[in-house]
From Swiss-Prot:
Involved in 1,2-propanediol (1,2-PD) utilization within the bacterial microcompartment (BMC) dedicated to 1,2-PD degradation by catalyzing the conversion of propanoyl-CoA to propanoyl-phosphate. It catalyses: propanoyl-CoA + phosphate = propanoyl phosphate + CoA. Its EC number is 2.3.1.222. This is Phosphate propanoyltransferase. There are 2 Zn(2+) ions per monomer; Zn(2+) and CoA bind inbetween the 2 domains in each monomer. It comes from Citrobacter koseri (strain ATCC BAA-895 / CDC 4225-83 / SGSC4696). Belongs to the PduL family. It is an enzyme of class 2 (transferase). Formed by 2 beta-barrels, each is capped on both ends by short alpha-helices.
């Protein structure tokens, strides 16, 4: 195979790979806890896995809490594991209105200046001083995925949600690249409802890097 033919073949294969569906994950409200906060809310209770998530090593735990805000509460909010360095609560805009909390749109881990909330478990309660956010929609990628899609960590792209009658394009979708990540787009329940992404046939495709 000559060089030109090889380059043409590789280019064609990469184009096909860029057009492949991106798995879509709908993130319901959930919490991440530090080891210290977990021990206070679930004293003597080892964290236990209920369901593995697509991202390696991550899982939904059996443990749940109630979120209590100035105007309302949300029960049975799932803990995601493993435990983190800092506690964090991720909710939708609809959840924020229910709770009466002005949660800002942030990337996971960007918690400076965020509001707090009360967490109640079957064993104890804990007032977080900060950590409540509405998560920025994003796509997890491995370095190889990023190379194929020609994007880099921190880029913003436009993504189409397809496979249903309510095709919708989301702009400002953040790219998150890490060696331990698998290709998956994360949106919250408000975004999923708007896009009709509750359909099992729904998937994401990259429209254009921005």
């Amino acid at each position: 195979m000559d060089k030109q033919l090889l380059e043409t073949t590789v280019s064609k294969v990469l184009d096909e790979m860029r057009e492949r569906p991106i798995p879509l994950g709908v993130s319901n409200r959930h919490i991440h806890l530090s080891a210290e906060d977990y021990a206070r809310l679930f004293p003597g209770q080892p964290i236990s896995e209920k369901k593995a998530l697509l991202q390696p090593g991550q899982y939904a735990a059996d443990q749940t809490v109630t979120l209590i805000g100035p105007k309302g509460q949300l029960k049975n909010v799932r803990l995601l594991g493993p435990l983190r360095r800092t506690s964090q609560v991720e909710i939708s805009r609809t959840d924020a209105r229910t709770l009466g909390i002005a949660a800002p749109l942030r990337m996971s881990g960007d918690l400076k200046g965020t509001p707090g909330i009360r967490l109640v478990s079957p064993f104890a309660e804990l007032d977080l001083a900060s950590g409540v956010i509405v998560a920025q929609r994003h796509i997890h990628m491995s370095p190889l995925d990023a190379l194929i899609f020609r994007v880099a960590h921190g880029d913003k792209v436009s993504v189409a949600i397809e496979g249903n009658a309510r095709r919708l394009i989301f702009d400002n979708v953040a790219i998150r690249v890490s060696a331990d990540m698998r290709l998956e787009m994360h949106i919250d329940t408000d975004e999923a409802n708007a896009a009709g992404a509750d359909s099992p046939d729904a998937f994401a495709t990259l429209v254009t890097p921005r």
